[in-house]
């Protein structure tokens, strides 16, 4: 993983946006997750940030932020509900026409910098990337499970029992003590 891109505060807005965007993408693809994205967004926007993605079961804030994540989860899950107190601004995380989560600036609206929303939008794009990565991992895992089960069904006598136990364990299933299939 590369060293983080450090963007000075005196850089132009475009330079700051580009640098923060690269850091967010690096965080997602490097496996640092939405917590790191929230931290980067908070630092760039100058306010605490929460990211809530119900589809992933994720609700995170930057370190040190004070927020009731259960309230933010409910808010993100119940679209159209009144914005909870302590949420200064929000940007939806959208996939096509579907809103799958929110990036929330925490605090008072008056305290937000004029370019804070730009950084929240970057966090929304990075969050969407995280959703795509997680869903791709899940799909690959499902395909591996399906092909393993098909192989067990099609040629049960040709497979080495130790290999079956090993492969099942890699897919999260402990067959070391045996199993019964109905």
Q: What are the residue ranges of the model-derived segments?
A:
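Hydrophobic, helix-rich cores of sensory/ligand-binding and other regulatory modules
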Residues: 1-182
């Amino acid at each position: 993983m590369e060293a983080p891109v450090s963007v000075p505060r005196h850089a132009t807005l475009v330079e700051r946006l580009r640098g923060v965007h690269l850091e967010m993408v690096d965080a997602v693809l490097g496996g640092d997750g939405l917590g790191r994205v929230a931290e980067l967004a908070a630092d760039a926007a100058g306010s605490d940030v929460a990211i809530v993605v119900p589809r992933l079961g994720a609700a995170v804030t930057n370190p040190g932020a004070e927020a009731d994540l259960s309230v933010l989860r409910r808010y993100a899950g119940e679209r159209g509900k009144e914005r909870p107190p302590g949420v200064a601004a929000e940007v939806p995380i959208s996939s096509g026409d579907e809103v799958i989560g929110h990036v929330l600036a925490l605090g008072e609206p008056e305290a937000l910098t004029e370019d804070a929303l730009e950084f929240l939008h970057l966090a929304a794009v990075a969050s969407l990337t995280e959703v795509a990565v997680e869903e791709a991992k899940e799909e690959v895992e499902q395909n591996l499970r399906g092909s393993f089960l098909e192989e067990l069904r099609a040629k049960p006598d040709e497979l080495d029992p130790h290999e079956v136990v090993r492969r099942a364990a890699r897919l999260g299933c402990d067959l070391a003590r045996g199993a019964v299939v109905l």
